[in-house]
């Protein structure tokens, strides 16, 4: 449930409003959406499901949200945030059959020195999130634009 909430908060609230306090940020999102209509809720559910499907289509159910540049078997919160945030901005048609190029770009991103530095300390710091998004989005735009 918290991961779903994280997806919505990071997609619909300004990252600049995030003060490195995840609980407060998620609470603020919940408060601002406590009166959503059933139609709005259905739309949000659809967005989440479609975005997750795009991630799984590209990386596979067993590999999605795992750092493919390492041998770690666990899914990573920072990759969940990064991929769900970025894939929500593109349609299935834009992603198309570019899975191999996207996987290669993610591997390059995960090996990037700046990206690796953004993972030191608390992974979900605003500065780290911004750094990772910038590095990843530069590579993804080349493929999907």
Task: List the predicted regions and their residue ranges.
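Flexible coil/loop and intrinsically disordered segments
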Residues: 1-145
């Amino acid at each position: 449930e918290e991961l779903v909430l994280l997806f919505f908060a990071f997609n619909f609230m300004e990252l600049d409003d995030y003060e490195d306090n995840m609980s407060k940020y998620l609470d603020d999102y919940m408060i601002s959406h406590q009166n959503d209509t059933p139609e709005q809720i259905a739309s949000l559910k659809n967005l989440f499901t479609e975005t997750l499907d795009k991630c799984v289509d590209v990386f596979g159910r067993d590999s999605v949200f795992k750092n493919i540049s390492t041998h770690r078997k666990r899914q990573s919160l920072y990759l969940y945030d990064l991929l769900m945030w970025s894939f929500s901005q593109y349609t299935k048609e834009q992603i198309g059959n570019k899975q191999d190029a996207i996987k290669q770009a993610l591997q390059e991103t995960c090996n990037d020195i700046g990206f690796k530095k953004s993972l030191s300390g608390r992974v979900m710091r605003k500065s780290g999130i911004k750094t990772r998004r910038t590095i990843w989005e530069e590579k993804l735009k080349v493929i999907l634009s």
